[in-house]
Amino acid sequence: MRYLNNAKKSILLIFGNILIGISCYAQMGVLKGNIYLKQNGEPVAGAGIFPVNDKSLGVASDADGSYEINLPVGKQTIVYTLTGLKNDTLTLDIKDGTEAIRNIYLTSNLKNLNVVVVSASKYEQRIENITVSMEVISPKLIENRNTTNVTSVLEQTPGVTILDQEPQIRGGSGFSFGVGSRVATLIDGLPIMTGDAGRTEWQFIPVENIEQIEVIKGASSVLYGSSALSGTINFRTAYPKERYHTYLRTYGGVYDKPSNREAKWWDGPATFSGINFLHSEKINRWDLIIGGNGLYDHGFIGPPLAMSSLPFQDTTISNNDVASRWGRLNFNIRHRFKNIEGLSAGINGNFMQSHSNFSLVWANDSTGIYNAFPKTMTLTDSKAFYIDPYISLTGKKGSSHQLRSRIFYADNDNGNDQSNKTNVYLAEYRFNRELISLGRLNVTSGVYFQQSFSHASLYAGSGNDKNTLENYAAFIQLEKKLIKKLMVSAGFRAEYFEMNNKESQLEPILRAGLNYQLTEGTFIRCSYGQGYRYPTIAEKYIETGAGGISVFPNPEVQPESSWNAEAGIKQGFKIGNFFGFADIAVFEQRYHNTIEYIYALWQPDQLAGFKFVNTGNSRVKGLEVSIMGEGKPVRNFAISFLGGYTYTLPQSLEPDYIFATDNPPTDFLPDSLSYSSTSTDTSKNILKYRFQHIAKMDIELTWKFISFGYGVRYYSFMKNIDKKFYDLDETVLPTGVKAYREKNDKGTLVHDLRLGFKLSEIFKASFLVNNATNLEYSLRPLKIESPRNYTIQLTAAF
């Protein structure tokens, strides 16, 4: 109760600060226009526009070259910049409440695609200037792929794999059954993972209102805290442009029959359909956005299969029960005040109600591969929302203050004593300033707190169905150009955790990086960063069971940590009017006290089951190449491209280290548990649930009103999984997993196709085919992926 009161006081303090801010006023004006290439008049997309005395106000030009920037009143000098183009400056007087229109013509040297990001340092930077590896996904790709769940577009991103809803970046994590993500997931820079299990609810992400997705590869705990052990995915939501915008997308589709016709469990068509909408508008000094979506999905994984050979059956789930349904509504509201320069305040929100299923194990490897094994499917009815109050103040001398907060609530009704409710209260104060007197030293610092409260009998392993986890942190990051072309950055974070008022941990975290501009379009970088992850409530205290599979608590599990080092080079290029970046990086990640989900006989008077334990030290090293670009090489013809290849060598450094022993009945000798004894393939000591080779490409070709898109993904064979799944295959869990993996050991190649027609300035129609070859494939062992499916999509934007 003490923690709940503290959380309420903290939230009230945040709201109080916002109300104080609302009593003040600010003076702002607007500068807008278009940016063109002087040589041919083509619009320039992605150019950076910022005032020299406050880069944090910077914006980027849109695909048509248009831009709009809010500026404090008074005399302002504006810089227009794009790598490979000559910078231009403009000096003018900004007047309160007025609009100035200026068109700018930039001259070419070498022309490159420019992307403005914020995730790397928590302030806006051009992507070629950052010291870490990052991929940026545009809203155009999200729309073109008919994205209803962001995992489908993340799966197309180089270096990123979504393994049954769990994100992996460069092989930095395996599979942990939905608990304890090693990748931090953020919306507008704040975590959006559940407070009990550290899991991301992907359908909760507002896909209709994403400005861009930024993926940081490698440990990034200095800025984003626990869970950013191997990377970060940040979803940046958009705010209105000067002109109102309304967007509607509706779609319908059907799953094809599986290539193994005998595995089809449904009668009639297996359909899915949905609608997305968004309206954004500026009304005087108010910025307003409202959006949402609704979806129905029959699904391709059916209810548990009747199996007479088992001592238990599961006939309570029907075909209709497994269909997914959800509705979501979100809003962004911001007010820009009149009489105090740079002051704004607002509130964002997102509400969702859903019905979904989770299948842990398929029924068998042939006719039951699209059905669940008895007692291993969970139906969930969820209600969730978050509310984000915030206030921001940008000063005349380039300083900025931001106070952002989030109230996140999730209620999952799973039945079978597995239901859970969590409340998360979090807030971050962040200060940023460029210190001119210290040679333009950029300082980003702040404090952060998060309090998570869980109420669930699922976590009674603590001795109570109510559990709390608190996290407090302070951080600072410094960036400076030591010489004209060398950028140096360094950061520090102190993290404090407390679980149930019984145990606590204080941990320092460091990072550093260099970026050197070798030529006009060539940037060399290197970086080192530490990561740290405290165990979740679920990892310590979960206690449940299903289908002969039990899960045991482990209050003794310890935090895991990592460090990441990499060196890379980013090369801008131009081929005609096609602009792009090519990037190559080599990296190494080390993990200490790695947490894994291990199956054993943990208690002599109960069935065997899984438990989270620390398994020792491991290493992932590798190489990654990626290319992104877009442009118009000839008149009426446009190309956009995103592709890459990732090689990883994920290895256990202590394959014979005994991290635990089981606890058999009397008169039986305990088994020693190590990497070697719990793995199906110990050659080269490859870690479990990793792909060593991943290649991806997405290309969109547009000619006049017709567009064609092609996406392809390759995954090498997953060499190593938990050996116990093979052992159980011969006893209580006859799934055929061993035979399936022996038969399908050559890797997986998946193709997607799409065709679009721009019917008018408002309407566009598209036809999409995912898994075009109707390949039967599994990425996460014991879970089949979707058969071929067809979608018709209609969008309207005005």
What kind of region is each of these model predictions?
Residues 36-40, 47-52, 81-85, 95, ...:
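Short, acidic, small-residue-rich periplasmic hinge/interaction motif at the N-terminus
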Residues 67-70, 190-217:
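Short acidic/polar hinge/loop motifs at secondary-structure boundaries
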Residues 100-105, 150-153, 168-170, 183-186, ...:
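N-terminal periplasmic accessory domains that precede
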Residues 134, 151-190, 194:
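Extracytoplasmic beta-strand/coil segments of soluble accessory domains associated
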Residues 249, 586-590, 611-723:
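Gram-negative outer-membrane beta-barrel transporters
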Residues 297-330, 334-394, 400-401, 408-426:
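Flexible loop and strand-edge segments within Gram-negative outer membrane beta-barrel domains
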Residues 391, 440-442, 462-589, 698-700:
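Structural signature of Gram-negative outer-membrane beta-barrels, strongest in the C-terminal barrel
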Residues 402-412, 451, 517, 525, ...:
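Membrane-embedded beta-barrel scaffold of Gram-negative outer-membrane proteins
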